[in-house]
Amino acid sequence: MSARRRVPNKPAPKNAPRLHQPGQAVLKAILPEQIDWKPFPAFPPSARLAVVVGQPLQEGPYTIRVKVPGGVKLMPHRHPEDRVYTVISGIFYIGLGDKFDAEKLHAYPPGSVIILPGNTSHFHWAKSGEYITQVTAMGPLGLEYLSAKDDPRNNC
């Protein structure tokens, strides 16, 4: 008979980042029609971002959703934080590298989970139509394009 390891039932450290804040209801649910899609200055104008949980621009855990319409490319960029992408809908095309190269794209269908280490240069393309991904990470969220000409924040 194998010995069972017990998981200790200890409270989280008092200074641990929390998603559930004091004073919030015990359960919080967000229905698809309640997702608040907004433009995000670091994305192409037609792409949208929605904050699901947390405060991405501050330290601590966050979850966002990203919606990119068909044909739109996010040129090579990187994020300082490690990220976990979950494909919600559409086909998510992501490639690694400092230059956009369609040959390096990998296609991930809904339900796929992609783990991307921080500071990894990568690019996206909504090659076959709109996609939605959910991104979970520890903030603050950062996004740096490898070429200033690709950064939509410079085209204002």
What role is predicted for each listed range?
Residues 1-10:
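Polybasic, low-complexity, intrinsically disordered segments
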Residues 43-45, 56-58, 78-79, 86, ...:
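Extracellular/periplasmic catalytic domains that process cell-envelope and extracellular macromolecules
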Residues 74-76, 94-95, 116, 121-127:
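Short beta-strand His + acidic residue motifs that chelate non-heme Fe in jelly-roll/DSBH
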